Amino acid sequence: MIGIGTAEAGYLPDWMIRRGIRWMLQNRLRGLEEPDPEAAQRGLAAFIDELRQGPVALKPELPNEQHYEVAPEFFEAVLGRRLKYSCALWPEDVADLDAAEESMLSLTCDRAKIQDGMRVLDLGCGWGAWSLWIAENYPGCRVLAVSNSKLQCDFIGARAARLELGNLEVETADVNSFEPEGLFDRIVSVEMFEHLRNWEALLARMAHWLAPDGKVFLHFFCHREHAYTYNTEGKDDWMGRHF
């Protein structure tokens, strides 16, 4: 805790913080490793079964308490112009955060195979970076942006009105009970599924929201071998506390 507090106070050089992060990650991975492959499979099956028994999201209000209900002025100070509250993309020719946000928004559209004229659901829309980008760049698309944060939805609605975007709707909803009207050509969810538990239940519902040729595009953090949830297991669990 002393080391983390010192780092957060800005007293440690970058190389030392990087070394500390690597050390913490190695410790985390050692705690997840299981040398017996059969035991590892049993553990994975038990993990999946536990997720299937619960709700889609355990505490949907918790992220709001942690950071989503922080005033947008804070995020305007630390994020790029688009307020993209998820990872950016840094090709070699990109040197600033605004351009990195644009690069990632464009890549998401390419991989989700967005076409003008589609009806699109942005599930877990954050501060509306992708929804607003779609509404601006694909004027024939009709976009529904969904967040469980009223503050975020109000912000997106105000920005859409300021930009005179008539093809963007915003809805505040709890993912446990959310049921949209109509069908969608694309459902896109960027860095929301990490916070969920019962993926199977939500994906089954999402299947009923798709048009006959519709597709779902998911972008989420994961490890190639280990399954885990975002938990705050202790005072030194930086990722659990802040993500």
Positions of predicted regions on the chain:
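Conserved class I S-adenosyl-L-methionine
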Residues: 116-126, 215-242
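Class I SAM-dependent methyltransferase SAM/SAH-binding core
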Residues: 136-176
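A short SAM/SAH-binding and catalytic strip from SAM-dependent methyltransferases
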Residues: 186-198
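Conserved Class I S-adenosyl-L-methionine-dependent methyltransferase catalytic core
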Residues: 29-111, 115
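A short glycine-rich, Lys/Arg-flanked "PGG" loop and its adjoining helix->strand segment in the class I
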Residues: 200-215
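Conserved SAM-binding loop of SAM-dependent methyltransferases across substrates and taxa
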Residues: 127-139
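A short acidic, Gly/Pro-enriched loop at the edge of an enzyme's catalytic core
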Residues: 177-187
